[in-house]
Amino acid sequence: MFVVVGLLLSGCGAAGSGNRTLARALPPDAEFTHPGVLVSAGQLEDMRKNVTAGKEPWLTAYLDMRDSKYGAYKYRAEPYEDVHCPAGGKAGQGCAQEREDALAAYTQALLYTVTGKKQHAEKAREIMDAWSAELKRHSGENAALQAGWTGSTWARAAEIVRYSEGAGWPADRVRRFESMLRTAHLPEVARKVPDVNGDRDLVATDAAIGIAVFLDDHDTFDKALARFRDRVPAYFYLDKDGRLPLTPAGSGITTPQRLTSYWHRQTTFKSGVTQETCRDVEHVGHAVAATAHIAETARHQGVDLYSETEDRLAAALDLHAGLQNSGRAPAWLCGGEVEGKLGPVLEIAVHRGIGGPATRKLAERTRPAGTNDLFVAWETLTHGG
C-alpha cells in the first residue's frame, strides 16, 4: 500500500528501520525514508494486519479511533489565516481548531491505512488542503508551542497520505502544504529558546524533525538532532549528572537560585526527576511523548537516539509511572505533592523496551491510549504490543 522511498545506509551499527543501519547521523548524501515520520511503512502494515485479524489491543484501539470525532466522514476543517495563541488563558483565534484539524487529518490517514476506503484519504486531503490554502502565520506568546503541537501532527498526516498508494494527493497541493509547513510552522519551531520549560522545546523539536523529513531537509533534520541532544540531558536527571542537574546549552540558568526556580523549587535530585516534575506530571508527559517521537522518527531515518537517551527516559518513566500507580509521592519530591498524570504517552517507549515493570503496568492498565487533543494520538494502535 505504501511507496517506500530511501537509500540504504552503509556503515556499522544496529539494524534500523527496514534495512537501514543505525548511526549517529544521517549522511549528507542519504535520502530520507518515506513514510518515516513517527510511523514507518512496516509499522503501518503491521497495524493494518493486526486490526483486520481482530487482535488486541489493536482492534479496540482502532475502534476508539474510528468512533472519535476525528474519525467522522462529516468532519469539517475550520482554517484561519492567523492562528493567534496568547498566554495565560487569554482568548485566542484558531488554536483549538488547528490542533483538532491536524489530529483529524492524522486520524483519517490512519483510517485509510487500515480500511483502504478512499473517503478517508479524501477527508485527510480536504483538511490539509483547507489549511494550506489559508494559514499564513502563528502569533501570540504561545505561537511556537502551537506550531510545535500542530506541526508534528501535520507532518505525520501528510507523510502517510503522500506516500500511500491510491491516496490521490495532487502534486500541486503537496507543494502548497510543504510551503505552509516551511513558512508558518518551521520558523517558530526552529528558533532556539533554552530558558523555556523543557517540554516546549522538545515539542518544537518534535515538529522540526517531522517537518524536516517531509520536506527532505537535511539542515533542519541535523539541527533538530543537535537540539535534542542538548535538551534531553538537561531535562531528565540521572545521578551520574552530579549533585545538580545539567542546564540547557546557552541558557541564562547560571546560579543555584535560578536553577531551583527553573526546576519548580525542587532541590533534591534523584534519577528520574525531570525539570517539570514539580510543575505537574502532565507536562512531563508532553516531554516524554516528544522525546519518544523524535527518537522514533530519527530511527526510521537510520539515526540512533534511543541508545543515547533510554537510560534517562526509562528512569523518568519508572519514577512517574510508579507515582501514578501508587497515588503517593515521597516527601523529598515536590514536598510530597505531585500533581497530574502522564497521559497517553507510554506506548512508544514500551514498544522499544524502555522502562521497567511500573511503566509497563501503567501502559497496560491505561490501554488503549487515545489522544491528548494536542499532539499525541492513537499510539496503542501504531506502537502497542
Kindly label every feature range from the protein language model.
Residues 1-17:
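Secretory targeting and sorting signals
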Residues 6, 17-196, 202, 206, ...:
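Extracellular glycan-targeting catalytic surfaces
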Residues 113-116, 212-216:
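Hydrophobic/aromatic side-chain positions at a characteristic register within alpha-helices
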Residues 197-200, 280-283:
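Histidine-centered active-site/metal-ligand motif
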Residues 207-211:
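Amphipathic alpha-helical interface segments
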Residues 219, 223, 281-292, 296-300:
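Active-site-proximal binding-pocket segments
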Residues 219-226, 238-247, 302-309:
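Short acidic alpha-helical/loop segments enriched in Asp/Glu that coordinate divalent cations
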Residues 236-277:
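Flexible internal linker/loop segments at domain or repeat junctions
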